[in-house]
């Protein structure tokens, strides 16, 4: 009976880890098909941010320049002009299709992540007792570690998150989150997040050491600074 009670929180933890993947897999076909039909049949107002609007304007300007070039080539045979106009028409249709696919992709991923968040929040709310048991297990495990091991783990975690080589890792992680939510890759936004987020984490971590660890375990702070130096 005791083993069964101990196994239930562990099974609950595994289900939380794999739940988002399972939701994404279930919604992949049904939700995407519904969003595609909704987008293609209903005349929706398109909301564009400044970067997307600039990109669209640049593409339309390129198409306009091609049409102007078409007017300048009227001395060419009519058959060549018809082929040229047909190519421009195909490019325009292709551009519209790509834009629609991008909007559908964005709506689909945002909806999937929103559904996952709501379900996981409800799942966690109804399983507070199991989460409390898992939290007590983690605290007991960390408490039984020596101060040297704790200092080593803290140093390893901080070097991974806010160390010298961390910007590349943050760039990959933020880029993955952008892709998961269906957003386009914007270098300016990505650079801004990579340059500011580790700094904020570093400040929070130093404040945590000053306020919490100095009071709870001064020896751990001494060992941490000795290893860090």
UniProtKB/Swiss-Prot annotation:
Database matches in InterPro entries: CemA
Keyword annotations of the record: Antiport, Chloroplast, Hydrogen ion transport, Ion transport, Membrane, Plastid, Plastid inner membrane, Potassium, Potassium transport, Transmembrane, Transmembrane helix, Transport
Bilayer-crossing regions: 6-26, 107-127, 152-172, 189-209
Source domain of life: Eukaryota
Catalyzed reaction equations: K(+)(in) + H(+)(out) = K(+)(out) + H(+)(in)
Protein location: Plastid, Chloroplast inner membrane
GO cellular component terms, semicolon-separated: chloroplast inner membrane
Disulfide bond entries: none
Molecular function, one GO term: proton transmembrane transporter activity
UniProt topology in membrane: Multi-pass membrane protein
GO biological-process terms attached to the record: potassium ion transport
Coiled-coil region(s): none
Role according to the record: Contributes to K(+)/H(+) antiport activity by supporting proton efflux to control proton extrusion and homeostasis in chloroplasts in a light-dependent manner to modulate photosynthesis. Prevents excessive induction of non-photochemical quenching (NPQ) under continuous-light conditions. Indirectly promotes efficient inorganic carbon uptake into chloroplasts.
PANTHER family: CHLOROPLAST ENVELOPE MEMBRANE PROTEIN, CHLOROPLAST ENVELOPE MEMBRANE PROTEIN-RELATED
Family to which this protein belongs: Belongs to the CemA family.
Protein name: Potassium/proton antiporter CemA
Gene coding for it: cemA
